[in-house]
Amino acid sequence: MDQAKLARMQASVRIGNPPSGPRANRNRGKGTPRRKVKKVHKSSGADDKKLQATLKKMNVQPIPAVEEVNMFKEDGNVIHFGNPRVHASVPSNTFALYGNGEEKELTELVPGILNQLGPDSLASLRKLAESYQNMQKNQAGAEGKKDDEEDDIPDLVEGQDFESKVE
């Protein structure tokens, strides 16, 4: 598009407050309506309200007295929610957790959560602990190999004789 034509089109559109200064009387014709400046205010509160409205349509009910929620990840870490607000809709199999989640290591939570686990969870926790120990061993073995490589003294190899070149 031609730059001059583009500049004329931009000048013909008035946005916001009327201009002041030497170009104040320019573009004052009736054919150029004033356009409002679009101000977008997006807040997380609006998202929460939409979520609450959707959950209300699903007929969720609050579940009281939930002290903590732990979500186990595949890498061995745990997402821990302390005193979350929990809402549930059993017919639609939907649960909503509200609160600040913290990512913690499994070893930080083990003593406190053992009495809360059932037999299925204990078996999965054992597998998770074994895989965690294997990861620890693999990391320690890799670090040990690096240390061994650094400490090795290179072997002497018969090569060129530089003393004869100095003379």
Swiss-Prot record:
UniProt GO cellular component terms: nascent polypeptide-associated complex; nucleus
Pfam families linked to this entry: NAC
Single GO biological process annotation from the record: protein transport
Biased composition (Acidic residues): 148-161
InterPro entries listed in its UniProt record: BTF3, NAC_A/B_dom_sf, Nas_poly-pep-assoc_cplx_dom
Residues of the signal peptide: none
Residue span of region Disordered: 1-48, 133-167
PROSITE patterns: NAC_AB (PS51151)
Residue ranges constituting the NAC-A/B domain according to the UniProt record: 45-110
Record localization: Cytoplasm; Nucleus
Ranges of Basic residues composition bias in the record: 25-42
Job of this protein: Component of the nascent polypeptide-associated complex (NAC), a dynamic component of the ribosomal exit tunnel, protecting the emerging polypeptides from interaction with other cytoplasmic proteins to ensure appropriate nascent protein targeting. The NAC complex also promotes mitochondrial protein import by enhancing productive ribosome interactions with the outer mitochondrial membrane and blocks the inappropriate interaction of ribosomes translating non-secretory nascent polypeptides with translocation sites in the membrane of the endoplasmic reticulum.
Family: Belongs to the NAC-beta family.
Complexes and interactors: Part of the nascent polypeptide-associated complex (NAC), consisting of egd2 and egd1. NAC associates with ribosomes via egd1.
Name used for this protein in its record: Nascent polypeptide-associated complex subunit beta
Annotated source species: Aspergillus terreus (strain NIH 2624 / FGSC A1156)
Gene: egd1
